[in-house]
Amino acid sequence: MHHRSYARPMPRYRRWFVPGGTYFFTANLARRDSSLLVDEIAALRAAYAEAAERQPFETIAICVLPNHLHCIWTLPEGDADFSGRWRRIKTGFSRRLPRESDPVPGRRAGERGIWQRRFWEHVITDADDLAAHIEYVHANPVKHRLVADIDDWPFSSWHRWRRSNLPGEVPG
């Protein structure tokens, strides 16, 4: 007797590449209990600045939390290589840390295991979508109960937005 399978194959995740587009990103550390991103904010700032120098992008908004970060970038016209930029940021940050920083067992040879291997991205579709994501980025420390008021979180472009509504660098 033949049994028909109704199981569906796992969908393959597909990235939507829009040259010159504006994107919302979330990048997570491998360990959810880690606070490396804020403990080592100088290393993150240096890696972020180096990546932006080598492959320019405009940071619209950013918020660094202990174990993940959210940001919104606009890429140069004709450029959709956000993956290369994230590779530079993650590698640059990891290389700046002491060897014993938050190791994750079970990684491939040569991998530090500081970051989750992937990141999440969303293409910003219009002005309302952009405004909603900027608000989400800046409100994240309150959402995670790290502070009661957005003004109290130092690792956010919120402070620059509040003063001038201009895009910022890595906060801290």
Where are these regions (language model features)?
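Short catalytic/metal-binding and nucleic-acid-binding patches
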Residues: 1-172
